[in-house]
Amino acid sequence: MAEKQTAKRNRREEILQSLALMLESSDGSQRITTAKLAASVGVSEAALYRHFPSKTRMFDSLIEFIEDSLITRINLILKDEKDTTARLRLIVLLILGFGERNPGLTRILTGHALMFEQDRLQGRINQLFERIEVQLRQVMREKKMREGEGYTLDETLLASQLLAFCEGMLSRFVRSEFKYRPTDDFEARWPLVAAQLQ
């Protein structure tokens, strides 16, 4: 019984990895059908539906992976790092690095892969970015407690500006067909971004 469960879990992971790879390829800029996905995995469409009731559920699973990866690591950054600017830098670098290492999933983060899918999926990505923005804002608000001095500009404005930088770099990565990596020249870009944090 345990072997059967493991085989089923492995097949599910194989399906999700194939979907992510298809999103990374030139197919990712077009609608991915279950027929194409089944062919990529080497199974029938019926076999896909034994593991996932719908393609939407496959995207849900990929979004869950994105959420878990980013939120878990953000929490680790907040636990380990106490300096506000360093925290913000590490969170931005985390988002950009995650996108760079997972090009197919970046198409989901930017919404490109979800254009032909249910609106609910885009809503989940919107909620993820809202959670990250709230976290950035909280980090900024804690600066006054931790360091004795807050920002002169509104934290809501600063957090949205920081997140817009991340979204812009991820969008550029997708638009360039993954040529312009989000972390390219990060060490030169970060001082420009950090200078806005006043």
Curated annotation (Swiss-Prot):
Residues 33-52 bind DNA. Pfam families: SlmA-like_C, TetR_N. One of its GO terms (molecular function) is DNA-binding transcription factor activity. The keyword Repressor does not apply. GO terms for cellular component: bacterial nucleoid; cytoplasm. Residues 119-144 form a coiled coil. Transmembrane segments: none annotated. One of its GO terms (biological process) is cell division. Residues 10-70 form the HTH tetR-type domain. It is found in: Cytoplasm, Nucleoid. Keywords: Cell cycle, Cell division, Coiled coil, Cytoplasm, DNA-binding. Homodimer. Interacts with FtsZ. Belongs to the nucleoid occlusion factor SlmA family. HAMAP family: NO_factor_SlmA (MF_01839). Required for nucleoid occlusion (NO) phenomenon, which prevents Z-ring formation and cell division over the nucleoid. Acts as a DNA-associated cell division inhibitor that binds simultaneously chromosomal DNA and FtsZ, and disrupts the assembly of FtsZ polymers. SlmA-DNA-binding sequences (SBS) are dispersed on non-Ter regions of the chromosome, preventing FtsZ polymerization at these regions. This is Nucleoid occlusion factor SlmA. The lineage of its organism: Bacteria, Pseudomonadati, Pseudomonadota, Gammaproteobacteria, Enterobacterales.
